[in-house]
């Protein structure tokens, strides 16, 4: 496979766009191929905390894969050098410092009708949305999120929890926790929208050893998912402490212990939290996380 993810996706997303910059210089936006992998990873490695999800997809599946749930595009200047990289698909992610590339990616996203969300740094997404809204789009829901990073783990009093990677026997509990968290965040139930696909993706992540849990008597007390991993950065999501066990310090100790484990194989760990959940910020700071920036996630109307 070298030029497309699936027939369904390539029917609605063009493989190449060409446009003129305000300066008169040309830009081209083209679907990236597996042979572009080294160049793309080098570009993304310049800002690893902001590109870990895209880089993680590529390291896991390659540039071209149905498991990326979208198509990677590169925006190049007249000199052929990358000015930006975007994953256009279920979740649209963008990395660029070039405003003309943002405009080009907005035009590209306009031609893809099935995106669920667009996520990125606040200022970049605001500029992107300025171009995208002019094409007739309105958000279904917008969330402001705070980016945190952990590079070292503080000493925390209390027993060290016996964290382990989840097993397939934990699958149903993990699915329920993740589905409930997604409904709370964006209002869409993944078990209704794509139940089989959602279950398959969670099961695959468990098989990869990327779901960490602490359990007692068969009940998951703590859970966290490693969504993406590179040598420079790990991105966590789906962090959850069982409702009956909150406020006892279990979550802080589990998250700190998970940091000790993961920082042995990556330089940093990052995560996002909804800015409305202020108490979570204190929770992450106790576990050694520091604030790094502001993100926007814009949920789109399904078409």
Task: Describe the function of each predicted region.
Residues 2-18, 77-83, 87-161, 298:
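Acyl-donor-binding surface of acyltransferase catalytic domains
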Residues 4-54, 153-191:
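Short amphipathic alpha-helix that is part of the acyltransferase structural core
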Residues 21-35, 42-117, 221-237:
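Conserved donor-binding loop and adjoining core beta-sheet/short helix segment
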Residues 99-108, 241, 247-263, 282, ...:
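Conserved acetyl-CoA-binding loop-helix of GNAT-fold acetyltransferases
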Residues 113-122, 233, 262-273:
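Conserved GNAT acetyl-CoA-binding A-motif
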Residues 119-125, 271-282, 297-303:
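Conserved beta-strand-loop-alpha-helix junction that forms the acyl-donor binding cleft
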Residues 158-233:
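Flexible, substrate/cofactor-facing loop regions flanked by secondary structure
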Residues 239-241, 273:
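Hydrophobic adenine-recognition pocket in adenosine-nucleotide-binding enzymes
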């Amino acid at each position: 496979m070298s030029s497309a993810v699936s027939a369904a996706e390539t029917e609605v997303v063009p493989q190449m766009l060409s446009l003129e910059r305000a300066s008169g210089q040309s830009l081209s936006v083209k679907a990236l191929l597996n042979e572009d992998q080294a160049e793309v990873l080098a570009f993304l490695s310049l800002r690893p905390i902001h590109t870990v999800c895209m880089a993680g997809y590529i390291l896991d599946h390659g540039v071209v894969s149905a498991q990326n749930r979208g198509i990677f595009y590169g925006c190049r200047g007249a000199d052929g050098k990358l000015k930006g990289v975007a994953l256009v698909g279920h979740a649209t992610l963008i990395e660029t410092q070039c405003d003309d590339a943002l405009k080009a990616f907005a035009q590209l996203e306009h031609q893809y009708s099935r995106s669920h969300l667009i996520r990125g740094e606040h200022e970049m997404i605001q500029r992107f949305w300025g171009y995208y809204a002019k094409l007739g789009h309105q958000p279904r829901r917008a969330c402001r999120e705070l980016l945190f990073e952990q590079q070292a783990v503080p000493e925390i009093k209390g027993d060290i929890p016996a964290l382990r990677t989840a097993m397939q026997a934990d699958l149903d509990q993990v699915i329920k926790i993740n589905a409930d968290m997604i409904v709370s965040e964006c209002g869409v139930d993944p078990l209704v929208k794509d139940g089989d696909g959602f279950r398959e993706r969670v099961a695959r992540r468990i098989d990869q050893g990327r779901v960490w849990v602490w359990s007692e008597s068969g009940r998951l007390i703590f859970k966290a998912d490693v969504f993406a991993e590179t040598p420079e950065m790990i991105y966590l999501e789906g962090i959850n402490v069982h409702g009956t066990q909150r406020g006892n310090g279990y979550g802080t100790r589990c998250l700190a212990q998970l940091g000790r484990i993961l920082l042995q194989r990556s330089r940093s760990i990052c995560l996002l939290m909804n800015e409305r959940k202020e108490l979570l910020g204190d929770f992450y700071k106790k576990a050694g996380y520091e604030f790094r920036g502001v993100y926007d996630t814009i949920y789109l109307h399904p078409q």
